[in-house]
Amino acid sequence: MKGIDIYSGQGSVDFNAVKESGVEVVYIKATEGLTYTDSTYKDFYDGAKNAGLKIGFYHYLRANDPTSEAEHFFNTISGLSLDCKCAIDVEVTLGQSIDQISSNVRKFADYLINKGLDVCVYTYTNFYKDNLNSTVKDLPLWIAEYGVSKPNIDASYVGFQYSDSGSVNGISGSADLDEFSEGILVGGTVVIDPGQGGDDNIKAIQQDLNILLKRGLEVDGIEGPETEAAIKDFQSIMGLTVDGIWGTNTSGAAQQIFSRPLDGVAYPHYEYATRYIQYRVGASVDGTFGSGTKAKVAAWQSNQGLMADGVVGSATWSKLLDEN
């Protein structure tokens, strides 16, 4: 699908002309940092919506508390109808280390995922290679690289920004030009090419499965039968469609678990985290944290030398994910 991404610097946009030119997807800048809101985001949204274009929003990530930045973005776009994944635009280091940048992206993404939103990461090829680690490479990728027919990256991607100086009917100046797959859409599946060896996305998935299922998969970036079987096992535990594809729902379930939410009878409901806890402690897996699950958690905690309170906090999550 042909796409563009725009912000207030574009000036006025004739969205009907944009659509007639063959564009299907429009990404609109909504926010940046802790407080900045793009002055045209709502006007652009209304215009694109009226023209029948598919709409997504992006946030330009700075070096602040990532949860606060995510909250600012979420509050800004709340109530608006999205066709495409929320994009986290990360492209400057701002004096941060690889781990700091990746942690910020992860926390921003997890905040939105826990709010029920689909997310993707936008960045440049070199930034992706040099400044992001494996903790965020399971997130759908929208990659930018100019002057090439295909980005020079060994990873699956749902979007490719191939120009920042394109010409589009309906926009007076230059525009960013993109090509998107169906994976950019809300609920869209990121299909992994099993013939692509050494894919960083697949390596990240294999690492996640080894942590979650203690499977001992070889982290080789190749989706063979063992990796597919592990994905299916995880999907079954999560109550998802068992198709062996690491799509949005499967990735979202894993991301909720890795966010390590405080979970227990008297705490907010996290279905996927609860299912994982039930699976690990030997409780009936139904996604509801009831008294039976609490008793199983308490017994497991006692066996691990933890305080047996039946509440899954940071110490219990550490045992579940980091040690056992």
Swiss-Prot record:
Q: Which UniProt keywords apply?
A: Antimicrobial, Bacteriolytic enzyme, Cytoplasm, Glycosidase, Hydrolase, Repeat, Secreted
**Domain of life the protein comes from:** Bacteria
Q: What is its main location?
A: secreted
State the name under which the record lists this protein.
Answer: Autolytic lysozyme
Repeats (sequence): which ranges? 212-234, 235-254, 255-277, 278-300, 301-324
Q: Does the keyword Membrane apply?
A: no
Q: Where is this region: 5 X 23 AA tandem repeats?
A: 212-324
Location of the active site: 5, 91
Q: What is its EC number?
A: 3.2.1.17
**Subunit text:** Monomer.
* Compartments (UniProt record): Secreted; Cytoplasm
Its family remark reads: Belongs to the glycosyl hydrolase 25 family.
Task: Provide one Gene Ontology cellular component.
Answer: extracellular region
Q: Which species does the entry assign this protein to?
A: Clostridium acetobutylicum (strain ATCC 824 / DSM 792 / JCM 1419 / IAM 19013 / LMG 5710 / NBRC 13948 / NRRL B-527 / VKM B-1787 / 2291 / W)
User: GO: which molecular function terms?
Assistant: lysozyme activity
Does the keyword field hold Repeat? yes
Reactions catalysed = Hydrolysis of (1->4)-beta-linkages between N-acetylmuramic acid and N-acetyl-D-glucosamine residues in a peptidoglycan and between N-acetyl-D-glucosamine residues in chitodextrins
Q: Which InterPro entries match?
A: Glyco_hydro_25 (IPR002053), Glyco_hydro_25_AS (IPR008270), Glyco_hydro_fam25_subgr (IPR018077), Glycoside_hydrolase_SF (IPR017853), Peptidoglycan-bd-like (IPR002477), PGBD-like_sf (IPR036365), PGBDSf (IPR036366)
- What PROSITE patterns would the database entry show? GLYCOSYL_HYDROL_F25_1, GLYCOSYL_HYDROL_F25_2
Q: Which SUPFAM superfamilies match?
A: (Trans)glycosidases (SSF51445), PGBD-like (SSF47090)
- Lineage of producing organism: Bacteria, Bacillati, Bacillota, Clostridia, Eubacteriales
Q: Which Pfam families match?
A: Glyco_hydro_25, PG_binding_1
Q: Which GO terms describe its biological process?
A: carbohydrate catabolic process; cell wall macromolecule catabolic process; defense response to bacterium; killing of cells of another organism; peptidoglycan catabolic process
